[in-house]
Amino acid sequence: MAPLSLTDIVSALPSEEDAWGPPVPTGNHLDGVPYAPFSKGDKLGRMADWGADSKDSRERGRQAYNRNYRDQQVYGAGTSSLFAVQVAEDESSFSVVDNTRTSVKTRGFGRGGGTIFRGRGQRGGAQRGRGGAFQRPAGGRGGQAGGDRYYDQRGGRGNRGRRFGWKDYDKPQRNRDSSVAIRPEWSMLEEIDFSRLSKLNLETPDGEDLDNYGFLYYYDRSYDKAPVKNTERRLRALERAAYNVTTSADPVIQELAEKDEATVFATADILSMLMCASRSVYSWDIVIVKHGNKIYFDKRDNASIDLVTVNENAADAPMEASEGQAKHDSINTPGALALEATIINHNFALQTVVESDSAKVEFSHPNPFYNPSEETEPLASKGFKYRRFDLSLEKDEEPVQIIVRTEIDAVLKNNISGEDQHVTLKALNEFDHKAQGAGGALDWRSKLYSQRGAVVATEMKNNNVKLARWTTQAILAKSDVMKLGFVTRANPRSATAHMILGVIGYKPREFALQMNLNMANGWGIVRTIIDLVNSLDARDEEEGDDAQEDKIKKYILVKDPNKSVVRLYSVPANTFEEEDDTGAKAEKDEESEEKDEE
């Protein structure tokens, strides 16, 4: 076969009329009907709309992804919005309803609104005769505002929003005041942050009972039953003599110190605050007195450590009233809520026992603070157990032991064994679950028994330090049962009337596990403070100071109001004694006025 030439190949190509490919003209009729080969909803004149949101920038989620997977430029995708009409917002019918709450200025608890309870400290004791905790706050006869200084002061801010700037997350959003004014003559010796406190650990054996004082009534089991709707019991105010004397003014502790039964002395309410220090938010202070080789953990009169805080650990804790709202004497400020909760706890422990002289448990000795010749009110059900704990280590040359005055509120018969069980009575209070500072709490009236676990879990979150202190006090006293009462306001806008919605019982050790409370960590904190105070004395001796057995040194441990640190200050030996004398004089004047009015 002869080879093909280029001319033969070109001549074999089809002619120009029969060129390869689709025909150039396209028909615009389909069965005689004209049509346009595009959708009316598509935007003409552009290849793509780059201003529209793509599928990647629209809302996430599988349903949204499946619904919006196709882009807007897909053929026919714009038909849905072809005839859409943009309706303008009609604001002619818009109106604002004034729903601001105004609290009516009401008379506070006791005389003048500022009294918690009439101070009934130890009378005729060896040292300071008065030491009752239920006394008049610093506000005196002026009203409830006196207790507010122990908590965050945010007056003047109002409802204005904040502008957050650089590193605002690391700054305290609420400036609170210290529980005690730091004086210029005080010298700071040590500063310990909470991260260091939380790492301390000291395994301590169970304590031993040294002596018991007082008596106990039996707990009323009817409060354990779920109340029928609209039949809740009203919390009553009972006039009973109750005492919360500081450590150094306790005559029993003074006697034990003279016998050298231990080297460290404290009360359960003071010690529980120290053991749960890393959970606290508000400021508090503890006075430490070193008398020779003895250490006393004391508290000031009218100190914040005696008040029961409310929602201290909530993410949005209760706020102080602004300058405009302060005129209405708001009842939901931290100080007012703490005063209300303290009174509720006092009355709840008195009301939930059956007062019967024929059915009560007498301890070995009578109440050491009650004087029948001076008191006109009957004595409240209270048992004081003085217990000793060993905090010694193997390296210690001398044993380190602490004596703690613990408290029991009632006694309960065991249903199986019939033995008497010691009971600790405490009360949680609800002020308004819709108000600011409620911490997302549920409505107790409708959810307490249907969602008990959720209610208790919320309280553990909002009142972590308060529940931890109560549990620590129950464990220190070796209580068998801890009863938690749930008390709410009869009217959310009034703090004068309360209803008991129910009572739930727990074993203290089990409740401590639920809230991750480690007693070994608490004992480690106590031992650290004891070693720190002893080391300061040793340092003074090395510097040449005269060491006298009867020399008194005083320190104060203060929790910073805005930071998670505690500071130890050295203060003069006569610090706070002038305040005690002034308070005693004011109390005498008040009692004389009451007699004149009668």
From Swiss-Prot:
Keywords: Cytoplasm, Initiation factor, Protein biosynthesis, RNA-binding. mRNA cap-binding component of the eukaryotic translation initiation factor 3 (eIF-3) complex, which is involved in protein synthesis of a specialized repertoire of mRNAs and, together with other initiation factors, stimulates binding of mRNA and methionyl-tRNAi to the 40S ribosome. The eIF-3 complex specifically targets and initiates translation of a subset of mRNAs involved in cell proliferation. In the eIF-3 complex, eif3d specifically recognizes and binds the 7-methylguanosine cap of a subset of mRNAs. This is Eukaryotic translation initiation factor 3 subunit D. Residues 104-178, 574-598 are annotated as: Disordered. Pfam families: eIF-3_zeta (PF05091). The keyword Aminoacyl-tRNA synthetase does not apply. HAMAP family: eIF3d. Belongs to the eIF-3 subunit D family. It is found in: Cytoplasm. Residues 589-598 have a biased composition (Acidic residues). Residues 109-132 have a biased composition (Gly residues). Component of the eukaryotic translation initiation factor 3 (eIF-3) complex. PANTHER family: EUKARYOTIC TRANSLATION INITIATION FACTOR 3 SUBUNIT 7, EUKARYOTIC TRANSLATION INITIATION FACTOR 3 SUBUNIT D. Its main location: cytoplasm. One of its GO terms (biological process) is formation of cytoplasmic translation initiation complex. The RNA gate region regulates mRNA cap recognition to prevent promiscuous mRNA-binding before assembly of eif3d into the full eukaryotic translation initiation factor 3 (eIF-3) complex. GO terms for molecular function: mRNA cap binding; translation initiation factor activity. It comes from the Eukaryota. Residues 165-177 have a biased composition (Basic and acidic residues). One of its GO terms (cellular component) is eukaryotic 48S preinitiation complex. Residues 304-318 are annotated as: RNA gate.
